[in-house]
Amino acid sequence: LGGNMDSRIKLFETIGNVLMIGTNDNLAIWDDYKLQSFDLGIGCVSDNGYVKALGSLFFIGYDGIFQTSGGLPKLISAKVEKYIDGATKAGLEAAAMGKKGNSIFCSIGTVTLYNPDGSEDMTLSDVVLEYNLRIQAWTIFTGIKATQFATYVSSDDVNSLQFASTETKYPIMELLTGETDNGKEIPFRIDSSNISLSKEFEKISYVHEVIIESERGSNIQCFVSLDREPFYEIEGTARKGATIMKITNKDGDHAKPPRCRTIKVSIRDFSKQLCKISRVALTYNSSNEEEQHRD
C-alpha cells in the first residue's frame, strides 16, 4: 500500500462498491479492477478500530477519527482532539469501535489532558468517545474497559451494543443500559470549556448567575472555576425545570459579584437519580476594567 512497508493490514472492509484496505499510515481501495492507494499519511491503527454506520465507514488513526464512504477520508474528531492527542500510542493501537443507534463509540484507553501552558491537567482512565451522527455532537465516557464492540439484534432491541471488558473475569457487558455501572452508582458530571466573557478578551467581567434548565434531576450541584483556578461549589441546588443559582466569591462573600476574564462551569449530581440537562446560561456584566496581568 505504500508508506511504511513493515506496517501490516489492520483495516479490511467493504464500503459502497469498493474494498477499503488500511495500514497504520496508508489507505487504499480495491474496485474489482485495480488497487488505488491514497498515500495520505493516515491509516487505521487498530485491528478493531473501525465500524460502519449510516452508509459510512469510520476508523481511528494516530491523528483522529475519520469518516469515508469509499473516497478520501474526512477528519471528524476536531472537537475532541485533546483526548486523542492525550491518548497513548498503545491506547490508540488497542482502540475498539462500535455503533448503537445514531452513534458510534471508540475506546482509546488512558488519556492525559494538559493546560494551555503545557502543564498536566488531569488523567482519565478507560476513555470511550461517543459521536452522535444525527446532531454531530461528542460525549466523553470514562471507566469503560472495552477491548471489542459488537452490535446484536435481539427480540426486544435492534441496537444492543455489547463489549468485551478487561474487568475481573473478563465479562461481556452491554453499553448504555440500566441505571448502574455493573452494580456501581454512576456519578453525573458535565464540565464546560473555558468561556471568555468579554468580546475584548483582556477586559474584566462580573458574573452574577448560572441558570440551569433540567428535564430530570432533583439535587443538581454547580461548581465554577474563575480564570482557570480550581473549581468551587456555589450555593443551592437545581432541580427539574429552570433554576437560577447565584455566583458568589469563593469565600462566600455576597457583597459584590466575582471578577474574572474567563469561567468554566461544572454541573454534578450524586443523588442516585437520573439527570438530564437541557440548557445552561450565564448572566454577567462586562466592564472596561483591565489588569496588567491576569490568568
Q: What kind of feature is each model-predicted range?
A:
Residues 17-39:
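Surface-exposed extracellular loop regions of Gram-negative outer-membrane beta-barrel proteins
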Residues 18, 26, 56-57, 64:
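Generic structural signal for coil-to-beta-strand starts
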Residues 42-56, 62-295:
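Beta-sheet repeat architectures centered on beta-propellers
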